Amino acid sequence: MLTGVPAAQRQAIKGHPPGVVWLTGLSGAGKSTLAAALETSLIRRGAHTMLLDGDSLRSGLNSDLGFSTHDRAQNVLRAAQVCNLMVDAGLLVIVAMISPLAQARELARSQLRHTAFLEVYINAPLAVCELRDPKGLYKRV
């Protein structure tokens, strides 16, 4: 990306290297809650962060997407592209989104290959996710 400030200079200004922590898991697993707690902890340590939540992206940037395999992959790819912009700005980016397709997550990782990328699967039991069910996705009819 074309920028007037070299990456090393941004890192010196921010006091840390940029990177991405990508939280994935079932709906109701606690991704958004954990992402918010992680961001709070990092900010307390002086880090410059940005939290990208899948629900926020779905209601804004990705509001034109449905839930087909193609659209789910596009949802993840667009999030990765936003991450690239944030990483170029020297931020630690925390992404919290279901991102169910392994191939799409791998594409996201490849889009961010020039930065530290940590994928974390939040392994909450299905029964817990069903109890929480913030979006009504597990509701039985």
Which role fits each region the language model picked out?
Residues 1-21, 45-48:
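Extreme N-terminal, non-catalytic leader segments
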Residues 7-10, 80-81, 105-107:
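A generic local structural motif
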Residues 21, 52, 118-120:
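Hydrophobic/aromatic beta-strand patches that form the interior of the parallel beta-sheet core
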Residues 28:
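Walker A (P-loop) phosphate-binding loop of P-loop NTPases
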Residues 31:
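Conserved lysine of the Walker
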Residues 36-84, 88:
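Conserved substrate/cofactor phosphate-moiety recognition/catalytic segment
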